[in-house]
């Protein structure tokens, strides 16, 4: 994978026209399009408004990718396949139907990922436990099993998330608002076979767990760092509980 970092160069001519060289390009993969919240509709319209890209140097593919089928692992894998086969953008950004974000959130996430060399960088968002907005946890985990196979996930404390505005390394993030580089998706496909070379649901205690966990554990097994951007905080309209804190996988 090429480690060269190229950032947009934005120049304004005497006549006021703006020229962008080396724009950051991204395609948005929208999950659960049949149940999109109004805030997400607004987020997508704003993010794909490329009249703004001359000012911020980010070009978003206005034809976002929609998955097929009801299963998240299949849907996300289908999004990746479509992205690699039919899009020529540099980044795939998963934006779930229950996440509200702004174009500035998207631009900040992509600029940080590209400038700092993150191949996978998630925005920070919280999920309410049992639907109670007063009791939330950030969707990010560290693996406390240093040696041996499997994982023992421990959730980040919210106090650590709000303590800074930079990107920090973690082991597992949610895919609700996450940027993934094209080279890393191509790289993964060399090691994991179809039909699920990227996302899969790990099983523990006869229970299927999130496809985002499976994806991140595969990345970490390949030595790829995963980042959580504490300065990109987006809204998450989730009512179900799916806390993996303490989850042990073998």
What are these regions (language model features)?
Residues 70-75:
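A short, glycine-/small-residue-rich helix N-cap motif at loop->alpha-helix starts
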Residues 3-12, 19-22, 189-250:
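C-terminal catalytic/acceptor-binding lobe
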Residues 88-100:
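Short beta-strand-to-loop acidic/aromatic patch adjacent to the donor-nucleotide binding site
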Residues 1-67:
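N-proximal low-complexity "stem/linker" segments adjacent to membrane-targeting elements
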Residues 78, 183, 214:
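Active-site phosphate/pyrophosphate-handling residues
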Residues 77-91:
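Active-site nucleotide-sugar/metal-binding loop of Leloir-type enzymes
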